[in-house]
């Protein structure tokens, strides 16, 4: 499956979030966090962890999911249009690549742990439903 996250630190870049994850690999803290992909504020996508490896992002679902972190401009956690569009494209590509059904196999971090992530799409379930519909349409277009 695919798990969608938000970075939780408004206004930051994909590179800054990647660098944060990379700094954790030094192992000086007891913090383990990573993601397969980060979608940045300009729609850029940074691949952080190979798809053949586990990213530490979704607790009990780390072993069977691909994680996507999405940057957001403000405290609401709503993705900008460019990041939304790129997250839809990336998620659709992953669904096609791994023969996944967006309605069943794309989930929020919240759906695994109860954490309010991605915040806007937990607080606005209709926006989450629209995201899944957009992913399904994008997958069909591939």
Language-model regions: role of each:
Residues 73-142:
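Basic/polar, cationic surfaces and motifs that engage anionic cell-wall
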Residues 1-100:
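Active-site-adjacent loop/helix surface patches within enzyme catalytic domains
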